[in-house]
Amino acid sequence: MDSFPLLAALFFIAATITFLSFRRRRNLPPGPFPYPIVGNMLQLGANPHQVFAKLSKRYGPLMSIHLGSLYTVIVSSPEMAKEILHRHGQVFSGRTIAQAVHACDHDKISMGFLPVASEWRDMRKICKEQMFSNQSMEASQGLRRQKLQQLLDHVQKCSDSGRAVDIREAAFITTLNLMSATLFSSQATEFDSKATMEFKEIIEGVATIVGVPNFADYFPILRPFDPQGVKRRADVFFGKLLAKIEGYLNERLESKRANPNAPKKDDFLEIVVDIIQANEFKLKTHHFTHLMLDLFVGGSDTNTTSIEWAMSELVMNPDKMARLKAELKSVAGDEKIVDESAMPKLPYLQAVIKEVMRIHPPGPLLLPRKAESDQEVNGYLIPKGTQILINAYAIGRDPSIWTDPETFDPERFLDNKIDFKGQDYELLPFGSGRRVCPGMPLATRILHMATATLVHNFDWKLEDDSTAAADHAGELFGVAVRRAVPLRIIPIVKS
């Protein structure tokens, strides 16, 4: 307790010096007045992506925000996003790293946070050319088909008993099963099981601790003290998940040593084992276990959120639901599971998913970037060390880009070639440039196929339609922005 006055004094001095030094700069992007010490933090509210979108209408597409002592520039237009992510992509390739990400040295090992150097390039090459190649995705689609059948069986049981389906819960378990099948040829969880809840606790523990507001991220002087216990809790959850992944990998390595001529499996783990045994890259086993942690946590949270929003929008817009059902019926017929190879024949399904990503980007501010050197953008100075947040939410709802941006209208994409693969800066749910999400090929397959399975096989009605509009409008900010109220809808077998 005796050290507290000294700590408080140092904290105040550091924050004041930082504040005054930034006030002296005359060529920063405009923004709201920052108060000493706290900056603009008191203005953010529960949904900062919405607040930033409103403020950008006043201050412009490049906006200065002070989050404590962390100077941040908010990017809110496709033109400025292209400047940051493409034209000056090398300068803005750094990462602002939250304290929680230091757990188990994840910040030093994960491809998502490694500097753009040799290790990062090797990991990127493996992801692009081997793990997420078209050949790899096609080889593992049979595994995913089995897990979609389990989703179908679960919903059928709910329909038979007249129970509502918690779409978030069903989407979460299905996403974990689809990912564990693709990564490990195994089933991570089952519906309504104890193992499900244990695995869910670990995954959500990691996602929650990474997304929780942490004073030490905004005031780095506090990091050694970990005042909220974020780092300590992150070490626990990261450690549990890494232990599970390492168990899968060690089991496969041992199996390959014992029986080197055994038939190969069509999962990612087989690719990883081959790479490790070939010793082709200067990478260690932990690079791959941390990559799989990123895939599990990022993929489960974003896909779960997007599937729930897709079903929420379709239930609230029955004419769009009917059109999608008709398209699925015309292509899949009486087949219960729509084949992944049928995707090019399903333009309306693709349009629905694009529209969901436009209105509800799962990570509305994307992963933070950091300026590696001073850089001028659009006539403004962005100093070295600045955190960069791309407001995909604001871009997706900008009326100068989209007609009736608050309206769910998949038809807007039927004659529009805009895609979310990183080349069109109007739609950036997976980012763009050298830091684009490496798991996008798997994530998009999961999202399209899970949504198609739910829509194709059942009609749906709300469990309680008295609060439907308010529930649909509410958002809960985190690593991914969820519905504030979980979507519960009753499945009805189509007659």
From Swiss-Prot:
GO MF terms on file? Answer: heme binding; iron ion binding; oxidoreductase activity, acting on paired donors, with incorporation or reduction of molecular oxygen, reduced flavin or flavoprotein as one donor, and incorporation of one atom of oxygen
Give the residue spans that cross the bilayer. Answer: 2-22
**Per its UniProt record, what Pfam families does this chain match?**
p450 (PF00067)
Enzyme Commission (EC) number: 1.14.14.175
- Cofactor names: heme
User: What UniProt keywords apply to this chain's record, in alphabetical order?
Assistant: Endoplasmic reticulum, Heme, Iron, Membrane, Metal-binding, Monooxygenase, NADP, Oxidoreductase, Transmembrane, Transmembrane helix
Topology relative to the membrane, per the entry? Single-pass membrane protein
Any coiled-coil ranges, and where?
A: none
Stretches in topological domain Cytoplasmic: 23-495
Q: Which GO terms describe its cellular component?
A: endoplasmic reticulum membrane
Task: Supply the SUPFAM superfamilies for this chain.
Answer: Cytochrome P450 (SSF48264)
Q: Where is the signal peptide?
A: none
Lumenal topological domain ranges are 1
- EC class (word): oxidoreductase
Q: Which tissues is this protein detected in according to the database?
A: Expression is more abundant in the rhizome.
Protein name per its UniProtKB record: Ferruginol synthase
